[in-house]
C-alpha cells in the first residue's frame, strides 16, 4: 500500500461525522485506483530521468565528463573554466535531451544540438 493510500484510509476512518463502512470502502477503492493511475502517469519516462544516476548514464553514453561536459580521454582532467560548447553539453547531461528539445533551449549547430537530435532519433526508433 502506498503511503498516500494509507493517509486517505486514515482520513476516511477518523472523519467526523463517522461514515458507514460500505461508503468508506467504496470511496477508498475509487480513489485508490485513480491515484494509482496518476502515479503511473507521473513516473519518469525513458530519457527524461533527473536523478544523479540518470545523469551519469547520459554522460557515459555521450562519452562526456559528468562534471565539466568535455570529451573523455585517457588523461582527462577537468578544467576550471569550461567552454560554451562544453557547458551546453553539460546542460544536456544534467537536464535531459527531451526537456531541452521541447523548450528549444539549445544553440543551433552546436554539439549539444547534435546530442539532442541523436537522442530524439533514438527515442523515435524505440517508439517511446
From Swiss-Prot:
Domain of life: Viruses
Keyword Zinc-finger: yes
Keywords: DNA-binding, Metal-binding, Zinc, Zinc-finger
Functional summary from the UniProt entry: May act as a regulatory factor during viral transcription.
GO MF terms, alphabetically ordered: DNA binding; zinc ion binding
Name of the protein in question: 14.7 kDa protein
Renumbered zinc finger spans (C4-type): 65-94
